[in-house]
Amino acid sequence: MTVKPDWLRVKAPQWERVGNVKEILRDLALNTVCEEASCPNIGECFQAGTATFLIMGPACTRACPYCDIDFEKKPKALDPTEPTRLAEAVRRMRLNHVVITSVNRDDLPDGGASQFVKCIAEVRAVSPQTTIEVLIPDLCGNWEALRIILQASPEVLNHNTETIPRLYRRVRPQGNYDRTLELLQRSRQIAPWLYTKSGIMVGLGETNAEVRQVMQDLRAVDCDILTIGQYLQPSQKHLQVNDFVTPEQFAAWQVYGEELGFLQVVSSPLTRSSYHAEQVRQLMERYPRNK
């Protein structure tokens, strides 16, 4: 099934604004998941002046068959100037909300937790009004590394579930479904004031019942925010799309998620984990939490 339906077509962006964002990113030698992972919303987000920064290099120590980020068994050493450069980009782009994510760095003892902390600190120093969302890997179950990140007090902790348990071995062979749930649960226990978030992609052969079960599992660990989007095959080398889920089904999942008690459900064919992430500021105003 290779022909994309009409609902997956994206509008052409205003390239002047996109060019301005790209110029800042190139000038500061920064990576974004928008570019590295070939996100279909790159034009819309860059046009709005937002980006999801990808730290710790453009290469990942895992080779998940759905992901378009490059694989390297031994990536380069961390760049000590990266946190400062990232913070400068936040300042130049005047971001109200920033998403900081990373490749998996299983080669590092703390999985890169210390680099997340440094990035958070630098952003706080130059743009204290900016809310910060970190989209983190599973840290190989290193819960002390998780605690280190949370002690830096990001407003949102995002860790993606990606798919249903039955498909984990094929889609996310180095991941673990139970570990993902435990990470989210521990995050809530360590930092009760935190907003937790997770996302799944569909179109890989899952059933409606299986998606609903994942949603129930996420609510059972008190996950606040859920994103659901259509998987799109980045290249012929990657996993094939099994089916294109209709907008009506995405809408039904949104309704179900709200019934389960998620504070926010973003569910549509083009939804990605950081899509419209800045809307969390309104959510924080509606559901305030004290540290």
UniProtKB/Swiss-Prot annotation:
The reaction(s) this protein catalyses: [[Fe-S] cluster scaffold protein carrying a second [4Fe-4S](2+) cluster] + N(6)-octanoyl-L-lysyl-[protein] + 2 oxidized [2Fe-2S]-[ferredoxin] + 2 S-adenosyl-L-methionine + 4 H(+) = [[Fe-S] cluster scaffold protein] + N(6)-[(R)-dihydrolipoyl]-L-lysyl-[protein] + 4 Fe(3+) + 2 hydrogen sulfide + 2 5'-deoxyadenosine + 2 L-methionine + 2 reduced [2Fe-2S]-[ferredoxin]
Positions that bind [4Fe-4S] cluster 2: 60, 64, 67
Protein EC: 2.8.1.8
Database matches in PROSITE patterns: RADICAL_SAM
Keywords: 4Fe-4S, Cytoplasm, Iron, Iron-sulfur, Metal-binding, S-adenosyl-L-methionine, Transferase
Taxonomy, superkingdom: Bacteria
Metal-binding among keywords: yes
Cofactor binding annotation: Binds 2 [4Fe-4S] clusters per subunit. One cluster is coordinated with 3 cysteines and an exchangeable S-adenosyl-L-methionine.
GO cellular component: cytoplasm
SUPFAM superfamilies the UniProt entry points to: Radical SAM enzymes
Gene Ontology molecular function: 4 iron, 4 sulfur cluster binding; lipoate synthase activity; metal ion binding
Residue span(s) of domain Radical SAM core: 46-263
Residue numbers binding [4Fe-4S] cluster 1: 34, 39, 45, 274
Pathway stated in the Swiss-Prot or TrEMBL entry: Protein modification; protein lipoylation via endogenous pathway; protein N(6)-(lipoyl)lysine from octanoyl-[acyl-carrier-protein]: step 2/2
Enzyme class at the top of the EC tree: transferase
Annotated InterPro entries: Aldolase_TIM, Elp3/MiaA/NifB-like_rSAM, Lipoyl_synth, rSAM
Chain coiled-coil ranges: none
Assigned protein family: Belongs to the radical SAM superfamily. Lipoyl synthase family.
Protein name as annotated: Lipoyl synthase 1
Species name: Nostoc sp. (strain PCC 7120 / SAG 25.82 / UTEX 2576)
Taxon lineage: Bacteria, Bacillati, Cyanobacteriota, Cyanophyceae, Nostocales
